[in-house]
Structure formats: structure tokens, C-alpha cells
A protein has these predicted regions:
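Eukaryotic scaffold repeat domains enriched in small/polar residues
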Residues: 20-364
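Bacterial N-terminal signal peptides
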Residues: 5-16
Length: 364
């Protein structure tokens, strides 16, 4: 069966790569960024903004690496803030929560429950709309456990444990309420739970072959219950059904300008940025995903270099792109999460610029 999956995946890989190569010159999409759309109280500050989500009322949830506590290195850095649709601050959710360690992603489900993935504590938490914890996935390492070394990367990695994570990154749901969690930096798998929180299995392992992963960084589901996984280190998006069967592999092949600015660090070397498992800074490598509501759904994808957002059809055709790396409005510094409550309305969480942006697109 595994050989069949690999063969199927390789067939789709070749076809999707060819298709995306044909879309090498999609148009730039004009857009605006709403100035000062979030209004923070005088005594609150964002740290690196790792997550952003929008509920059915238009409320915006920002997950930031603010409220830092502890030593300079290894400090806890996670804070969840809610804003109204007008950008006015409403409340902090989960102040001093036991799970807070290193903020990674926030999502809102169809019932307006708020979900948070914390990479540092290896925990996913579900809050109800009132802000109370109603479900917990995974377990934070015990403070008294001398063997707890969550930042170690043994090679080969230790075997995954059912129901537990190692540097978890994101979560999504299907129409039946099953939960899919991208687990993430180390375990390199998708973990599945039923709607009551019971373990239902997993798929994936480290590697670059079809069905394998190198940093699952974001995960979303469309209305057909197809699961899109941002396989960041391999610079691709893998699409599965709810049982873990590989359906297709999507790649974004839109070349970056030779003079494209870099958000931070040295310019990615072409050879290193395209090597298997080392595609994190390759143009089009997926850092963040979101899918618009219907009736026609679109997939938005963000990369770190050259700092673009791409608009795709669900079968991987690139319709256009917007943005570039930088520090002023309409520029981006490592987009870490996207929310797209409408086709032409996109919310952006940025790590390097410590901010969120609300974008209004004006496609021609």
C-alpha cells in the first residue's frame, strides 16, 4: 500500500510541477493595507505576531509572542488578544495560561471556538467563544522532569507517541468535526482526532518523498474535506483526503526578481534554497495557508522570500501575487499566518515586523 501511495504521489508531483511551471508569470494583484486597523491599549504591545484568525462576527484574534516572562533565552512568549470588527481591543484570552510557551498559530472553527497551537509547550488548546478552555491536545513537559529537553533534535528523531506532539504548528477540521493537527517540526506527521478529542491515527514521516514532510508549518481544509499541508522545508503543498491518502502535490514556481529585498539575513543561495528538505526560503515555499469561503474557494499562500502572497485555485493554478519583503505598510516581514474571511480580504500575521495587517485586494 505504501508503494502505491508513493507511486500515486510521484505521478501527481510531476503533473503539478509542470502545470505550475506554465504559470510562471501570473499578474500582480493591486491591494491596500488598512492603516492602524488594530487599536492596542497603551499598556499592551505585540511581540512577533505568529497567528491571526477571524470569527463569524468579524472579530480578529491575534496570537503574539508578547507578554514575555522568564529568562532572556528560553522565555515564555505567548499572548492571545481579541479585537472587534472595528479594530477596537476587546480582551485578552487565557492570561497566564499553563499552555503558554511559544505562540505559533490561532484558528477559529465554524462554531467560533478559538484554537491555539503552542510550539513550545507541544499543546493545542480549544477555547469556547467565551474564552474558557474546553479541550486540550498533547501535554506540556513537566517542569520537574529532568529528562524533558523539548528543543533537542536527535537524529534520527525519537519515535512519535500517539496523542502527543513535538513542536506542533497548526490545526484544521473536516465537515464531520474531526481535528487534524500538523505535528510539525520534529514528528513530521499529521495527527488526527475525532470530534470528541479521541486519537484517530496519523500519517507522514520525515523526508522529501511524496507523503513525507520537512516541517509541516500550516494546514487547512476545503469544503470537499481535502486537507492542504504546507510542507515548508520541501517547498510544496501536499493535499490529502481525510484518511491520509495523498491526492496531489502543488508547487508555486513564480521566480523572484534578482533584486528582490530580503526581510532579514543573507540572500538565499539558489542551490541551498532548492535542495530537498531545505526549501524554507525558496520563492513560493509555503509558510502560511488560508482558504476562502465559497461558493468558489481560493487558496492563499505566503512565502518568506521574496515575501509574497499568492492566490491559487484549489488545483494549484497561480492566479496572481502581491507584496514583497519590507517594513512599511504593504510590505511583509516573514508572514507566519493568514486569515481570509473573504476572497478579497486577507489578514496577515508578521513575525519580523511585530504586527498584523488587514489587506483589501483590488483584482483587475
Amino acid at each position: 500500500m505504501k508503494a502505491v501511495w508513493l507511486a500515486l504521489g510521484m505521478t501527481f508531483l510531476l503533473s503539478r510541477t509542470a502545470e505550475c511551471t506554465a504559470q510562471s508569470s501570473p499578474p500582480e494583484i493591486p491591494f491596500d493595507s488598512v492603516p492602524d486597523f488594530l487599536q492596542l491599549p497603551a499598556d499592551l504591545y505585540f511581540g512577533e505576531v505568529s497567528g491571526i484568525a477571524v470569527n463569524s462576527k468579524g472579530h480578529v484574534f491575534v496570537l503574539s509572542r508578547g507578554n514575555t516572562t522568564g529568562p532572556a533565552y528560553g522565555a515564555a512568549a505567548a499572548q492571545l488578544l481579541e479585537f472587534g470588527s472595528d479594530g477596537k481591543f476587546l480582551r485578552e484570552i487565557g492570561h497566564n495560561l499553563y499552555a503558554w510557551s511559544y505562540a505559533h498559530a490561532v484558528r477559529v472553527d465554524r462554531d467560533d471556538n478559538i484554537w491555539v497551537a503552542d510550539k513550545g509547550s507541544d499543546v493545542v488548546v480549544r477555547f469556547n467563544p467565551q474564552g474558557r478552555v474546553t479541550m486540550v491536545f498533547g501535554r506540556k513537559p513537566e517542569a520537574s522532569d529532568e529528562s524533558a529537553h523539548p528543543l533537542e533534535h536527535p537524529s534520527p528523531p525519537k519515535p512519535p507517541v500517539d496523542g502527543m506532539f513535538r513542536q506542533v504548528t497548526d490545526m484544521t477540521w473536516d465537515s464531520a468535526g474531526n481535528v487534524y493537527i500538523s505535528d510539525g517540526y520534529i514528528n513530521s506527521r499529521v495527527a488526527k482526532f475525532d470530534r470528541e478529542g479521541n486519537w484517530a491515527g496519523s500519517w507522514g514521516e520525515p523526508g522529501s518523498a511524496p507523503g513525507q514532510f520537512s516541517t509541516l508549518h500550516s494546514i487547512v481544509t476545503d469544503k470537499q474535506d481535502r486537507i492542504y499541508v504546507a510542507d515548508r522545508g520541501n517547498a510544496r503543498i501536499q493535499v490529502f483526503d481525510t484518511s491520509g491518502k495523498l491526492l496531489s502535490i502543488l508547487r508555486i514556481d513564480v521566480p523572484a526578481p534578482r533584486d528582490a529585498p530580503v526581510a532579514i539575513g543573507n540572500r538565499p543561495a539558489e542551490a541551498g534554497a532548492t535542495a530537498a528538505g531545505n526549501g524554507t526560503l525558496r520563492p513560493g515555499s509555503p509558510w502560511a495557508l488560508c482558504i476562502t469561503p465559497g461558493p468558489t474557494q481560493y487558496l492563499y499562500v505566503a512565502d518568506a522570500f521574496p515575501g509574497r502572497i499568492y492566490k491559487l485555485t484549489l488545483d494549484g493554478r497561480v492566479l496572481g501575487w502581491l507584496g514583497s519583503s519590507g517594513k512599511v505598510l504593504k510590505k511583509f516581514g516573514w508572514i507566519h499566518e493568514l486569515a481570509c474571511p473573504a476572497e478579497n480580504e486577507v489578514f496577515v500575521a508578521e513575525l519580523l515586523n511585530w504586527r498584523a495587517q488587514k489587506l483589501i485586494l483590488h483584482p483587475r
